[in-house]
Amino acid sequence: ASVKNTRFLTRERTDGTDDQWIFLPALGRVKRIAASAGGGSFMGSDFTYADMASTTYDTTEAEHTLIGQETVNGRSAYKIKSIPYDPTAYVQTIIWVDKEHDLPLRVEFFEKDPTTVSKVLTTDDIAFVEGRWITKSVTMTTVATQHSTRVEILQAKYDIPMNGAYFTTTFLETGRLQ
């Protein structure tokens, strides 16, 4: 199915929860994503709506433990176990973070059982853009089916003024500033 002109908006609230909306051209309208649907597949992909908001936790959202140091795809990485205080989508993640660039190289997601990996996110490409290292493409693989979905950042711009109207459901629906 074509995803052309599909638009997705996530806004983090002050209480740490997210509001999410999606515009699907086939429906011609904006649809709010219920918080309970966060674990649902994002447009039939291996990503969930919760994954699209974030795949990591800050220190107020999870307990983080350094459990080792390993090499991932030739890069030296910290291996960190994160257990969220409020496990909604995942009960645990294990993240390999590039020591030099502070980017995730691999993330293992545990949905219900902290001993069984459900999904694996791998970083396929990183790039130096406008003075910072960024993740350019990632692949999420569902372990049970070995099906995967690749997401690629085609363009990134930083430190530019942004009109708040971009972050509204009106813009989501029309694709134009009012």
Please give the residue ranges for each predicted region.
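Short, solvent-exposed mixed-charge patches
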Residues: 177-178
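N-terminal mature ectodomain segment of secretory-pathway/periplasmic proteins
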Residues: 1-26, 65
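Gly/Pro-enriched, hydrophobic low-complexity segments
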Residues: 9-11, 19, 29-33, 40-42, ...
